[in-house]
Design a protein with these regions (language model features):
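Long, terminal "pre-/pro-" and other extracytoplasmic accessory regions
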Residues: 2-191
Length: 191
């Protein structure tokens, strides 16, 4: 079993064990889809991961007191782009890196609002993006042909990864995974 999938299985088992210790007997993880052989689509050195991590570090250096609200990789449409969004007491910021032109743009998107902090997450507490992308790929039933985008953000009270793959016929499949515990939330194929 490859390390990313093993990591997800270990984290899932740990969550269930902790739930049992704390008396949460109804806790359950989404069933894993068995894929033979398991394919690693990306690793920690893949451009979809390295670029996002580098931009996150740059954002934290520029805004050391900020909390992160989104990290994203987007290759849909053929242009590779990375984005990190965050907020501190002085406002909401977005840092964007365009791979083709090697340009970084930062823009202030608005004023600080207390509600924005509720939509933040600690990037040190989420599952590694490479492991999540590989797990998401396994859920596509072999139909994924390209990694179009991934993002991690707060949605409906949870920090989630949304991973989008291209499929044949210019269609897509979206996979949503809990970014903290690895629970599979949904898999949606374009019709």
């Amino acid at each position: 079993m490859e390390e990313p999938m093993k990591s997800l299985l270990i984290k899932g088992s740990l969550v269930l064990a902790l739930a049992a210790v704390f008396g949460m007997t109804n806790a359950s993880a989404a069933p894993l889809v068995a894929v033979e052989p398991t394919v690693a689509v990306v690793d920690g050195n893949h451009a979809a991961i390295v670029g996002a991590n580098g931009l996150l570090n740059a954002f934290i250096q520029n805004h050391p007191n900020a909390v992160i609200t989104e990290i994203a990789f987007d290759a849909d449409g053929g242009q590779i782009k990375y984005e990190v969004e965050g907020v501190d007491e002085s406002g909401k910021y977005e840092l964007t890196y365009i791979y083709a032109t090697n340009q970084i743009f930062e823009k202030r998107e608005g004023d600080y609002h207390k509600s924005l902090k509720k939509k933040s997450f600690d990037p040190r507490e989420i599952l590694p993006p490479a492991a999540v992308v590989n797990f998401a790929y396994a859920q596509t039933q072999g139909k994924a042909t390209s990694l179009n985008e991934w993002s991690v953000h707060h949605e409906k009270g949870k920090t989630i990864y949304k991973v989008t793959f291209g499929t044949e016929g210019a269609k897509e499949v979206d996979v949503r995974i809990d970014a903290i515990n690895g629970t599979l939330l949904s898999v949606k194929f374009d019709d």
